[in-house]
Amino acid sequence: MPQNEYIERWQKQYGERLDHEERTRKRIAREAHKQSHDAQSFRGLRAKLYQKKRHAEKIEMKKRIRAQEEKNVKSSAPNEPSSTPLPNYLLDRSQETNAKSLSSAIKNKRAEKAAQFSVPLPKVKGISEEEMFKVVKTGKKTAKKSWKRMITKPTFVGADFTRRPVKYERFIRPMGLRYKKANVTHPKLGVTVQLPIISVKKNPQSPMYTQLGVLTKGTIIEVNVSELGQVTASGKVLWGKFAQITNNCENDGCVNAVLLV
């Protein structure tokens, strides 16, 4: 047992003091007095930190009290039905309702909304710069300059991409590692379609990799889903949708992704 747990060891061997419950009750009762004394006596940074902590505690306590009060509150509409029609979002309030069920429905809607933005791979392994970039030596005779980097991972460049002059190009993206299409799987339909990549939305490794269009595991890409014939609620054809890469493209030689629906 660690040396600093001698009190716990003593309690296990001999039991607690006979007045343990009484002392605990008195300590809890004195807590409010101690908090008041600390709030009045602390000065400087210590006072600011203490005030911030108490502020957060009070907010949490008020939330708990409000949730407890709203738990079983019932509301009922007037007995006489109104002649004016009600909109859809007010129809569920015409009969006696329970506030608890209403609040749980709101929470479920929020959870569904949060699930829309959840991704298949929430965490990915970090990639070091040594693995991502290969140093390219330059210099006419000595080859002493080493400011250029060659990207060793697959990349995506748009159709309107033009290389900078070789003399000023810092990051080199090899032609053999450029991908234009991805094998996208629809999670609900269970079909895999090869779709053209529109852009790289976010690379989890670094914003610089997003700017360079590097395709690594966990990267969010935008793909052209017009071939799938998906439409919005208003009837418009969906053009681009996000997908997350699920494989190591440099090992497999292709880009596999799951559509975010």
Swiss-Prot record:
Keywords: Nucleus, Ribonucleoprotein, Ribosome biogenesis, rRNA processing. GO terms for biological process: rRNA processing. Residues 28-37, 57-73 have a biased composition (Basic and acidic residues). Residues 45-56 have a biased composition (Basic residues). It is found in: Nucleus, Nucleolus. Its main location: nucleus. InterPro entries: NSA2_fam, Ribosomal_Se8/biogenesis_NSA2. Involved in the biogenesis of the 60S ribosomal subunit. May play a part in the quality control of pre-60S particles. Belongs to the eukaryotic ribosomal protein eS8 family. Ribosome biogenesis protein NSA2 subfamily. This is Ribosome biogenesis protein NSA2. It comes from Ajellomyces capsulatus (strain NAm1 / WU24).
